[in-house]
C-alpha cells in the first residue's frame, strides 16, 4: 500500500494500531477511536484550530481509502479551551470514558506537561505535532 499524502498520520496510525493491539485497546468493532486534543477556544484557538482541521482532513482521507486495516478511524474532538489544567482533565476523559486508542494534540509545552501524568498513569499514547524542545 502506497500513500502520497499525510504520511505522518499513516505512520502514526500504524503505530497506534500496533500499540492498541498490544495494550488490549483493539476492539472487534469496525472503528478505531482517536482523540483530538487541541484548543478550539481561548488564546491558543487561533493556532490550534487549524491543527484540528488538518487532523480531521487526514482522517477523512484515510477513511476514504479504506481506513486502517479495513477499520474506519473515528475522531473524538474535545476543546481544552486554552486552559492548561483542563488539558489533563480532557485527556483523562478521552482515555477513560471515550476509550480512544491514541490522542493527537498538545501543541504547547505547558499542555504536554499538564497531560503527562495522565498518559503515564493510564498508559496512553500521545502524538504531538512538533518537535519537543527537550529537557
Where do the PLM segments sit?
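Sec/Tat signal peptide C-region and signal peptidase I cleavage site
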Residues: 23-28
